[in-house]
Amino acid sequence: MLAALLYGKENLRLETVPDPTPRKGEVVIQVGAATTCGTDLKVWRRGGHAKMLKPPTLFGHEAAGQIVAIGEGVTDWQIGDRVVANNSAPCMNCFFCQRQEYSLCPNLTWNNGTFAEYLKIPAPIVKYNLLPIPEDLPDELAAMTEPLACVLHGTARSNVKHGDKVVVLGDGAIGLMFVAKLAHDLEVEVLLFGGNDDRLEIGKKLGAAQTFNYRQLPDIPTVIKEYTDSWGADVVIEATGLPSVWETAIACARPGATVNLFGGCPRDTTITVNTEQLHYSELTLKGVFHNTPEFVRAALSLIASRRIPFELLISEQRPLQDLETVFCDMRSRKVIKVAMIP
């Protein structure tokens, strides 16, 4: 089969590799659509990921498709079933899993390789995080289940209350998903900050009450205070993964606010925090990572409901052979998400 392999920093190659064969408890799907992700872009640019993968490796982690092979012991699925698989599954046995803190599981089973014609799903993911796709839901929408599950997890951990003013920093796919979830389901006022006018316009379509191009602003915290009676935002969600923006997020918060530091920064980076602000303003700073089986199911259900036009996030469909060009387009912010069709 044709598959993308990551060998290092911006070193992505399409190669012919053996078709996968399922072992006990596993299934193999024919990929119908694999969507690109901001995490993929960061991994491509950085040459690896602290938890998910180490080069050389098959690449990509969002996909939907159809089961074409079933391993020994698999009884809940049949060849021909349309499915979407999360890119991980918890062990269900460790200290954290016993406390239902599944995203902290040190034994997470990770799966990469969606940018390929076929994808093998490991047995733990088949058991805990493989879901049937509703008949009328296109593969490219179902493939966005994993990132939306992360966003639903992040939203649930952000202490959002009715009527809050919520600031989202970042107009990538994750930031826009946060806007959509917050605006449609939580009755809050969302202020979106980003650097691309086209993406900010999509943010408005997804429910942002106000959008701001940070390139045209002297100072983001000052603008936020103008919209919040000089206090700052009730909740701030950072969705860029840049240490400087983590610091900006904290500066945007009112006393008593929650700051969700959602975007993963490069390894071994640090930030500076004003201890006086943190202590006397009683700020809550949260790092939120990945998703859980509960949110994977909730994400697919939300996408399938079609209440929110998540298709706005898919800029185009492209053949797998164009993958490197697509990543260059993502780097220059010409596209948000692209559905790769093997």
Tell me the role of every PLM-derived stretch.
Residues N196, C265, N291:
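Residues in the short beta-alpha loop(s) of Rossmann-like NAD(P)-binding domains
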Residues S158-V160, H184, E201, K205-T284:
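Glycine-rich cofactor phosphate-binding loops and adjacent beta1-alpha1 units
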Residues R82, L137-L217, T222:
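Mid-domain Rossmann-like dinucleotide-binding core that forms the NAD(H)/NADP(H) cofactor-binding site
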Residues P218, E247-A251, T292-P342:
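C-terminal hydrophobic helical "lid"/dimerization subdomain
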Residues P18-A34, G48-F95, L131-D136:
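Glycine-rich beta-strand-centered segment in the early N-terminal region that forms part
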Residues C91-L169:
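NAD(P)H dinucleotide-binding glycine-rich loop of Rossmann-like/cofactor-binding domains
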